[in-house]
Amino acid sequence: MLKLVIIENMAEIMLFSLDLLLFSTDILCFNFPSKMIKLPGFITIQIFFYPQASFGISANTILFLFHIFTFVFSHRSKSIDMIISHLSLIHILLLFTQAILVSLDFFGSQNTQDDLRCKVIVFLNKVMRGLSICTPCLLNVLQAIISPSIFSLAKLKHPSASHILGFFLFSWVLNMFIGVIFCCTLWLPPVKWGQSSVCHTALFLFAHELHPQETVFHTNDFEGCHLYRVHGPLKRLHGDYFIQTIRGYLSAFTQPACPPVSPVKRASQTILLLVSFVFIYWVDFMFSFSRGVTWINDSLLVWFQVIVANSYATISPLMLIYADNQIFKTLQMLWFKYLSPPKLMLKFNRQCGSTKK
């Protein structure tokens, strides 16, 4: 009974925060300056970018509030809650800084690049992007430890809060240092750096983004090998099973209850999703690296890179919400209590009746 009351309170908090956030994101979308209307294809990009940023900020805020609430009031493993809260906060700041850069016409105008505001926002955006790569690396390592008795790093399964905070501090300092180097190479002309310095800086930035993704691949390989030894070949990783998983995710809110998912299925889904996220970052990095080496400022290429770079911050909270049974049950209760079509129709009829009186 107490657990049901806690879930209902979480649903009320989520509903209020979602209404407030959707109002704020509407203001964000419709009150941006109109400098970028001069760019070719801006209307098409605006159709994709602003709803994507608004949806990503909303989903990450729900995830952030839920895990903060769980970290403070619940008795679950607090290391995972700290990491996911940190990741969702990073994604919120990343999408906000990207939206500010879009509103300031940073990608289309050369005059705004001399503004101190733009330099600060670019620095923050680069730091948030680096943190959004490093933090899933730690989360993936913790989730990949399936059998602590076999894995040599079993002591990392339940790290203390001080170790997690130490990792956060180290990642923030490292990515701020990387952001300073990136901004120096961005604002200073190549003549002052020299050709060799530019190449060394590009290789350094490449290594900085390569190592966390390499760790993700290694942990996924370990997880897949362990599942192969224990459960045999993972045939469900291929073909129709992945399509059925996506269909089940899209139709989950139309059913009052969802069947329990086995750890093997959930681990296989995690492997596929993390590999797809790494693929998204590689596409983004190839665009960034090619533009940095060739110094080509094609507006269509830049806009496509912006959409790709924001896709991970938009999709990852949905996957984390779907993987957490408690959040999923809370959202289902919120749906059937307030947002299902019969409830909305009843609420609409009551409002119409009150206006007639």
From Swiss-Prot:
One Pfam family matching this protein:
V1R
* Protein keywords: Cell membrane, G-protein coupled receptor, Glycoprotein, Membrane, Pheromone response, Receptor, Transducer, Transmembrane, Transmembrane helix
Cellular component per GO, a single term: plasma membrane
* Glycan-bearing residues: 297
First-listed, main subcellular location of the protein, grouped into a coarse class: membrane
Cytoplasmic-side segments: 25-52, 103-130, 185-269, 322-357
The membrane topology noted for this protein in its Swiss-Prot or TrEMBL record is: Multi-pass membrane protein
Q: What is the superkingdom listed in this entry's lineage? A: Eukaryota
Q: Could you confirm whether the keyword Cell membrane appears in this record?
A: yes
- Extracellular-side segments: 1-3, 74-81, 152-163, 291-300
Its localization reads: Cell membrane
Q: Which terms does the record give in the GO molecular function aspect?
A: pheromone receptor activity
What biological-process terms (Gene Ontology) are attached?
response to pheromone
| InterPro entries in UniProt | Vmron_rcpt_1 (IPR004072)
Q: Per the UniProt record, which residue ranges are transmembrane?
A: 4-24, 53-73, 82-102, 131-151, 164-184, 270-290, 301-321
Which family is this protein grouped under?
Belongs to the G-protein coupled receptor 1 family.
Role this protein plays: Putative pheromone receptor.
Q: List the protein's name.
A: Vomeronasal type-1 receptor 5
Instruction: Name the source organism.
Output: Gorilla gorilla gorilla (Western lowland gorilla)
